[in-house]
Amino acid sequence: MNNTAGQPLYQRIANDFTAQITSGALKAGERLPSERQMAEELGASRMTARQALKLLEKRRLVETPVGRGAFVAHSQIEQQLS
C-alpha cells in the first residue's frame, strides 16, 4: 500500500484498489475481500475498510449488493475501455 503522508488510511486503501482496478489487476465482476478480511490483511479496523469500500462505490468502481459483498463494477471498466 502506498504510504502517502497526510491521507487517511481509508483513502490510501481505496486508492490502492482504484489502481488495481484501473490497471486491470482486478477484473470486472471480481469479488473484493470482505470488510473483515480487508481489515485483517491491512491491519485496519472494519470501519476503515467500510469507508474505503464506500469511497470506491462513490467512484463507481465497486458495486456492493446488499448481503453479497463487494464486486468490481462492470459499467466503469467498460466506460474506461471505450
Please provide the spans of the model-predicted regions:
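Extreme N-terminal segment that seeds HTH/winged-HTH DNA-binding domains in transcriptional regulators
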Residues: 1-46, 54, 58, 77-82
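Minor-groove-contacting beta-hairpin "wing" of winged helix-turn-helix DNA-binding domains
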Residues: 33-34, 63, 68-74
